[in-house]
């Protein structure tokens, strides 16, 4: 199916060509000069919305840059594409699906139409069932097979069925029930499962198996290992229904596994895995923090959805961050984006955003199936501050690669232990200042540094950063933050003319692995028909495996 959204190829659009010319004019301008020319730049190039303060003044851009980027968004029919998504059009063209993760956080009573039906009542029916179940587990009403209270919840899932809940559990740990632990089994590596269950009691453990089809290889391998572990300790098939629930739509397989389908929580084809943490996939999150905090997170998601849908582009947080990112990706040739949260609880945010961004926009053909002639999604990486300052910040400051950075911080800490937070935030502010303005040779020389050491002590500066500041990390703020990045990724995908909601790139490796598994398990020497490298690796593995 072809797209009707972008009839003119991206690089032929007037705004793109104007941006290319504009880049040549300002590419060498230093942030020192931009701030010297405009003493109010720090206030002018900032946006306050939805509880966030975005300072984008330390970016290598001008008013004209922003104007041209906004025109590019208009030429890409961004407003039309936003409405198409929110209204349930099948904008995931390769899979012929609507993209309605925004419906997961729509308030009760809202109307979101998909294939002629309002999906909101069903969304809230699932949320209500989740809340009832979460309260039973948290309150001790739900008991294990031997009558003991559940002390640990293990989420079994991979990809979007793991990264979102894992990130959210850490992010909201301050709000969680500390007497109830949540762990995650994702990797098919048996060591992951072994460590997850290492010190657990089967009769105090609840497993949530997250797989829409209930056939996902990694998830079901871990689920069956968990089932065997429970049965070995409890000795009765009837125990499975007390220690397993499912997030799935395949009732037949769920029931076959031994799970009561009354404890199966569904979600829909219009929810992509990487956009599903606020669906039933978030059941472990709801159990950890409680329904009230989970619903507060949903309210945050929805508030950012409405901001994205209604705010003009120049006052729109996701659009502005998307356009700035595109400016570096497509004109400065930056290949990565560092996400640097200065909050311990957001330690897993970079890994979550890796999947969100790289699986969405890591595409080499456009929505019409044509090869792109420009760079698409960046590499996303990062680590919490101040840890990263003592590892990779050296390269950002003095290396040869341009690495735009998103700094995320909070004015109030959830754990006021003096003087920790002031020291943390002093580093937060200092890093963006140092990256922007650096340290000149004259400044270093004035400190009495020896001539031979001067080149090593100079900081070029002109390293671009966004600073995203909020009051404090709450469930609502987390929802807003994740929705901000969701819509940022969507905006960039629209301009690049991509289908940001499929992920065919993950399929080929899975298919090949399915062929190789019997070759590794076979008692007889298999006849291999791979390339010479893969054949040799398989034979070496089989020899070493036999010696174990």
Curated annotation (Swiss-Prot):
Alphabetical list of HAMAP family matching this protein: G6P_isomerase (MF_00473)
Family: Belongs to the GPI family.
Catalytic residues (positions): 359, 390, 510
Presence of keyword Magnesium: no
Source organism phylogeny: Bacteria, Bacillati, Cyanobacteriota, Cyanophyceae, Gloeobacterales
One GO CC term, this protein: cytosol
Source organism (scientific name): Gloeobacter violaceus (strain ATCC 29082 / PCC 7421)
Catalytic reaction annotation: alpha-D-glucose 6-phosphate = beta-D-fructose 6-phosphate
Location in the cell: Cytoplasm
Gene3D superfamilies: 1.10.1390.10, Glucose-6-phosphate isomerase like protein, domain 1 (3.40.50.10490)
EC annotation from Swiss-Prot or TrEMBL: 5.3.1.9
A single BP term in Gene Ontology: glycolytic process
Superkingdom as given in the UniProt entry: Bacteria
Molecular function per GO: carbohydrate derivative binding; glucose-6-phosphate isomerase activity; monosaccharide binding
Gene: pgi
Function summary: Catalyzes the reversible isomerization of glucose-6-phosphate to fructose-6-phosphate.
Protein name, entry field: Glucose-6-phosphate isomerase
Principal EC category: isomerase
Predominant cellular place of this UniProt entry's protein: cytoplasm
InterPro entries attached to this UniProt entry: G6P_Isomerase, G6P_Isomerase_C, Phosphoglucose_isomerase_CS, SIS_dom_sf, SIS_PGI_1, SIS_PGI_2
Disulfide bonds: none
Keywords noted in UniProt: Cytoplasm, Gluconeogenesis, Glycolysis, Isomerase
Pathway involvement of the protein, from the record: Carbohydrate biosynthesis; gluconeogenesis; Carbohydrate degradation; glycolysis; D-glyceraldehyde 3-phosphate and glycerone phosphate from D-glucose: step 2/4
Entry keyword Repeat: no
